């Protein structure tokens, strides 16, 4: 394998943020996640590592373990060769669900976590409309105010 300088830099950023924790958590569950989203209803416990949110918004040990701590980490997650495509695939599956609100699809409070996650990624990936499409479809275009506050103060 030829390692380019750009690839090396991306991997250093990825390693610095320990994104492997997300890859590891997803490895055994990703097929189940896809299946649940295709069926239009989340039933498992995976929201934290599929749709991560900014640090400080979740209070459980799992939420803290999978919290995104900076804009740079969120950008690295979105650009990661495994996590980025999986994130977009899952958002596409959610966005393709017709006739159901996000609370029915994800349950509560996971509907709030999804909004927070979409807000975070929309802010760090402004050229990628998939995040704002989800906000538009399920939240009337209203971003999560707490996530925006955390991003402003970080």
Cite the ranges covered by each PLM segment.
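Extreme N-terminal tail/first-helix region
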Residues: 3-31
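Short amphipathic alpha-helical segments and their helix-coil junctions
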Residues: 23-36, 94-102
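Amphipathic alpha-helical segments within well-ordered protein domains
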Residues: 34, 75, 118-119, 136
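Hydrophobic/aromatic-rich, well-ordered segments within soluble, folded domains that form packed cores
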Residues: 36-71
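Short helix-capping/linker segments at secondary-structure and domain boundaries
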Residues: 56-62, 122-131
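C-terminal end-helix/capping segment
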Residues: 67-86, 138, 145, 153-154
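Mid-chain, well-packed structural core segment of small domains
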Residues: 76-121, 125
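Charged phosphate-binding loop/patch that engages nucleotide di/tri-phosphates or the phosphate backbone
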Residues: 126-154
């Amino acid at each position: 394998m030829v390692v380019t300088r750009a690839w090396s830099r991306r991997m250093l950023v990825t390693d610095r943020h320990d994104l492997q924790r997300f890859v590891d958590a997803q490895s055994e569950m990703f097929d189940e996640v896809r299946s649940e989203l295709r069926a239009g209803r989340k039933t498992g416990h995976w929201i934290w590592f599929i749709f991560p949110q900014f640090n400080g918004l979740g209070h459980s040990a799992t939420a803290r373990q999978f919290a995104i701590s900076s804009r740079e980490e969120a950008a690295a997650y979105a650009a990661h060769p495994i996590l980025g495509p999986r994130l977009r695939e899952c958002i596409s599956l959610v966005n393709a669900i017709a006739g159901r609100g996000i609370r029915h699809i994800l349950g509560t409070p996971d509907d709030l976590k999804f909004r927070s996650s979409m807000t975070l990624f929309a802010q760090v990936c402004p050229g990628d409309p998939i995040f704002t499409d989800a906000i538009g479809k399920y939240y009337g275009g209203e971003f999560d105010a707490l996530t925006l506050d955390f991003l402003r103060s970080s």
